[in-house]
Amino acid sequence: MTNPSPRVTILCDFDGTITPSDLADFIFRNFAGCGLFYSQQWAQGLIDTREEITRTFATITASREEIAAALAGIAIDPTFPDLVAFARQNGMELAVVSDGLDWAIDTVLKAHGILGLPIYANHVVFEGEKLTCEFPWYDSSTPLVGVCKPLVVRRYRAEGQRVIFIGDGRSDREAVLEADLVFARDALAKFCQEQGIPASGFRNFNEICSQIARWLDDPRKNLAAGEPPGL
């Protein structure tokens, strides 16, 4: 039986972590009249996530059904379902926290038979033929992103829970400063190393399950010690 108030919550980034690609970029590349123009501006730090999404959405004319059909073919890490099962078996909450699009994330997860995960992301709204976005997790403390991931971390910690964070990119940087245990790869692993933030590398979610099990046995352990990213 699932614990209604788990002692440990796992927060996992989506784009580049659960999927090898970025869902928003996939949608923009295939369905937006402007393509990746605003995404490239975001990558250069010229605009924030809210402007990137809002301006790009204004050029999308495809239907919800067309986009959903394309998203259904997106691959996920084949070991992610193992993390879902591990969390549920151990009474932990597992949630997705992403600076991406909630509807797109939910569509991909459902296509792989994964249901019921909380998703903290920018909220896609379909209004007839019009596609818009709301930003319920925006906070001025992280102005360049639509989802303030530290805000989500603090939400769980305020309930007395320990938070495990898994990520790979720029929008994850502030969150790792507040998590109890961090798993990082790619750009996020480099950031953690440069900033002296303890973090364990990972190649797949089975490795993460094993390391979390060790940590639960003794949370005082520093799993990142002597474990460079990818080992």
Tell what function each PLM region has.
Residues 2-123:
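Alpha-helical substrate-recognition element adjacent to the catalytic core
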Residues 79-93, 100-231:
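C-terminal cap/substrate-recognition subdomain and adjoining C-terminal extension
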